[in-house]
Amino acid sequence: MSDGTSKSGSKSSFHFVAGLGSGVLSAALLQPIDLLKTRVQQSPHQNILRTVSEIRHTSPAGLRGLWRGTVPSALRTGFGSALYFSTLNAIRQAAVPLFAHDAAVTTSPNGGNFANNKNNSSRLVKLSNTGNLLAGGVARGFAGFVLMPLTVIKVRYESSLYSYRSIAGAAGDILRTEGPRGFFAGFGATALRDAPYAGLYVLLYEQFKRRLGGVVSSSAAPETNEDNRMGVSRAAAVNFSSGVLAAVACSVVSNPFDAVKTRIQLRPGRYRNMVVAARTMMAEEGARSFFSGLGLRMSRKALSSALAWTLYEELIMRAEVGWSLSSSRTERAM
């Protein structure tokens, strides 16, 4: 294998590792919010306070029961983030000739381009709005399909409708009662929720970064690093704020699909598919049921997305600096 190919492979692998680390951390920290969302969505009569009270009084672990399902959630979110970020990076690199952003860019050691100015808080590839929308949607759809079995197990394990004692027990019961198809229950609703969400998220995230970066740079004292980019602390603040704003906007748009998906995964016998689930929910509970758990989901999405993207961007930024220094030393030695 050539040295160039080896370096390219290691850099692609680093996007996977960076995504894995950021995903596991955010999942572990925010599992209580995810569990509460699942419990609230499983019944029209549930609310946050009642759910917390039930967990506190009925769970053998007390309030530690809020972390029930952390392992499948961390596995799903961790490997989902790893697969998503590495796939997204590959798609964005390949899409540069078709959807390159029209701003002045500099070639990065990772093979793409990034804006090289004091308003920029990122070293990720810069694409047009259309490019970001398509890249985010395709990457999320692919990652969602691969990780769907873990998603189903996670939702069932978190729900109070099932008394699974272990992840293996949950997987065995699903396989025994529903067959392999049971591991993909709700994939249609999940894909319709996640692919547009991810595409719109990447688009808005990049837009917010560009606009907030300009505001921060123009309203504060200069803080740039050696390559004239925004300083680390301000870059992290811009990235985190952009992640929160993008997640809030996307959560509102995609929540109906999330509510439908949860019903299908929890009660596949009653809610056989998206159409049946949507009709039943509308007839029995009204339009409000499609926004059940919105506050919890919005909170979790805002925090998890912002944490994951900020940590991912920071890891990639540090890696890019290391690769640049390594390349410079190699060139001087030749």
From Swiss-Prot:
Family per record: Belongs to the mitochondrial carrier (TC 2.A.29) family. SLC25A38 subfamily.
Organism: Pyricularia oryzae (strain 70-15 / ATCC MYA-4617 / FGSC 8958) (Rice blast fungus)
Gene Ontology terms: cellular component: mitochondrial inner membrane
Chemical reaction(s) catalysed: glycine(in) = glycine(out)
Upper lineage: Eukaryota, Fungi, Dikarya, Ascomycota, Pezizomycotina
Main location: mitochondrion
Keyword set includes Cell cycle: no
GO molecular function, one term: glycine transmembrane transporter activity
UniProt keyword terms in alphabetical order: Membrane, Mitochondrion, Mitochondrion inner membrane, Repeat, Transmembrane, Transmembrane helix, Transport
Membrane topology summary: Multi-pass membrane protein
Cited HAMAP family: SLC25A38
Transmembrane segments: 16-41, 69-95, 133-158, 186-209, 238-264, 293-311
Claim: DNA-binding is one of the keywords in the record: no
SUPFAM superfamilies attached to this UniProt entry: Mitochondrial carrier
Localisation: Mitochondrion inner membrane
Protein name in the entry: Mitochondrial glycine transporter
Function summary: Mitochondrial glycine transporter that imports glycine into the mitochondrial matrix. Plays an important role in providing glycine for the first enzymatic step in heme biosynthesis, the condensation of glycine with succinyl-CoA to produce 5-aminolevulinate (ALA) in the mitochondrial matrix.
Any Pfam family matching the protein: Mito_carr
One GO BP annotation of this record: glycine import into mitochondrion
